[in-house]
A protein has these predicted regions:
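Domain-level signature for soluble enzymes in the chorismate/prephenate branch of the shikimate pathway
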Residues: 1-310
């Protein structure tokens, strides 16, 4: 049976994302080569890093982890583990609308403490100030743990998920709580390196590059995409943890490694960068950006020139 680790415990948004992936697989919308998602065993891990390391160590076949929030930006433990840890590859992604529930058995104006995972607290800070100004915010180990803390009487209210509130049988005193409307988080399924899912025409490719320490090296790496009409949709810098002021760069681009323009850009990066770590090509329906230019017309024209045609 397939084993999929996820950033737990049960009831977190990450488990909800994994359940969504399994539902998409059951409907034939999502697939990972050589892995059966439907009916897979879900294994809770205490952190994003732990979930990914379970895959690297062979304790799980895949890991489901958050990678980017529309409010808070990159999920750095995920980026750093993919960038510096044992080689892993992204095979699929999904995203969730992120709105919280306030779990509490008492009216909100009577709550004196409200537990929140730090990332969640940052996303509902204004709502709490407006609706629960009397409540002290205390840290929770996770979104689901906030509901458990309420159920066990350690706090009066918790910023949690609807799934966790139901799981621990705590009433939802408020739902749809978020400072930013339509906030979303991307989640990815990662496994050991292998063949990428087939090109769909609506794909994402990710790499981590280490460029030489000289003027213009990052601009040159970015130009390898621009000159080929490949749309970069995300660029993140992360410290290398070796020399102060040195960084690697995470690039997401529109397209698949089997797209000629993307393949050419990756080969060029290998020539101009000190290191290139391929994080995968996978379907991303409805993702941002513009698809790579089809080189077919220019290749036909060029081949005609070689044949002496004008």
């Amino acid at each position: 049976m397939t084993r999929i680790a996820y950033f737990g415990p049960e009831g977190t948004f990450t488990e909800m994302a994994l359940l969504q992936c399994q539902d998409l697989a059951a409907r034939g919308v999502m697939a990972v080569p050589g892995v059966e998602l439907v009916g897979a065993e879900r294994i809770s891990a205490p952190s994003q890093v732990a979930a990914l390391e379970m895959v690297a160590d062979g304790a799980a076949d895949l890991a489901c982890v958050p990678i980017e929030s529309s409010v808070e930006g990159p999920v750095t433990p995920t980026l750093d583990t993919l960038g510096f840890g044992a080689p892993l590859q992204i095979f699929a992604e999904t995203d969730l609308a992120v709105a919280f529930s306030i779990a509490s058995p008492k009216p909100l104006d009577e709550a004196r403490t409200v537990g929140a995972y730090p990332v969640a607290a940052a996303q509902v800070r204004a709502w709490l100030a407006a609706n629960m100004p009397q409540a002290q915010v205390v840290p929770a180990a996770s979104n689901a743990a906030a509901a458990l803390d309420v159920a066990e009487g350690r706090i009066d209210a918790g910023v949690t998920t609807a799934l966790a509130a139901r799981m621990y049988d705590v009433p939802e005193a408020a739902t749809g709580v978020a400072d930013v409307a339509d906030a979303r988080t991307r989640f990815v399924l990662c496994g050991k390196p292998g063949p990428a899912p087939a090109r769909t025409g609506s794909d994402c490719t990710a790499v981590v590059i280490d460029v030489p320490s000289r003027p213009g090296s990052l601009a040159l790496a970015m130009a390898e995409f621009a000159l080929r009409g490949v749309d970069l949709t995300r660029i993140e810098s992360r410290p290398k943890r070796t020399v102060f002021g040195s960084y690697v760069f995470h690039f997401d681009c529109v397209g698949h490694i089997d797209d000629p323009a993307v393949g050419e850009a990756l080969r060029a990066l290998h020539r101009v960068c000190d290191d290139v770590r391929f994080l995968g090509s996978w379907p991303r329906p409805g993702g941002p950006g513009t698809a790579p230019v089809d080189p077919g017309d220019s290749e036909e024209w060029f081949d005609g020139l070689r044949r002496g045609e004008r």
